[in-house]
Swiss-Prot record:
This is Ubiquinone/menaquinone biosynthesis C-methyltransferase UbiE. Methyltransferase required for the conversion of demethylmenaquinol (DMKH2) to menaquinol (MKH2) and the conversion of 2-polyprenyl-6-methoxy-1,4-benzoquinol (DDMQH2) to 2-polyprenyl-3-methyl-6-methoxy-1,4-benzoquinol (DMQH2). The gene is ubiE. GO terms for biological process: aerobic respiration; menaquinone biosynthetic process; methylation. The lineage of its organism: Bacteria, Pseudomonadati, Pseudomonadota, Betaproteobacteria, Burkholderiales. One of its GO terms (molecular function) is 2-methoxy-6-polyprenyl-1,4-benzoquinol methyltransferase activity.
Amino acid sequence: MSKTHFGFESVEENEKAKKVAGVFHSVASNYDLMNDLMSAGMHRAWKAFTIAQANVRPGFKVLDIAAGTGDLTKSFAKAAGPTGEVWHTDINESMLRVGRDRLLDKGVVTPSLLCDAEKIPFPDNYFDVVTVAFGLRNMTHKDAALAEMRRVTKPGGRVMVLEFSKVWDPLKKAYDLYSFKVLPWLGDKFAKDAESYRYLAESIRMHPDQDTLKTMMEQAGLDAVKYYNLSGGVVALHLGTKY
């Protein structure tokens, strides 16, 4: 059986999904806190940039994968309006429930669906925009997930991947110190869960860098793939178009 990475640990492919699920079941109730700790609060600016680049308009159909607590979903639903169709999806039931409840609390009524990005339950050429924010690095078969995202995107539509990436060299030493020393300590202090936060830091280091992910998206059949480095490469937003 093939091996894959769970953070820095080498595990069987069929074990990774279970281990990742355990992490997100554990952090679901504190997910927004987790994002604040991992990004020093910058995730709001990164998501705002992604929302602006998505340029969702009234009537659009949008698929938000690994949507978590629904930050992107909320903005997309408002932009698409009553004639649009925006799906809030996640493979993790705990995350999906937290996100669905949060959306309802904010007056956003939009469908939520338990969804594996490697087997997206929608027809070909269905969505105008497909997004995944901070979720791709946790997927076992990233190439399969990207191919599925392209499949369900309409011709002329876009796939957008917002993810932690490779930081610029002058920032690397400070970033490593924060990721491997400060972040687990914060996770233990504020969420009583140092191990989950340690995995999340490790998963970022194992994720493909900017150019590698660009190539993967091209190999999945997307065209005109480009990326924006945000905060010195801490995060990158990749965009690809389906022609």
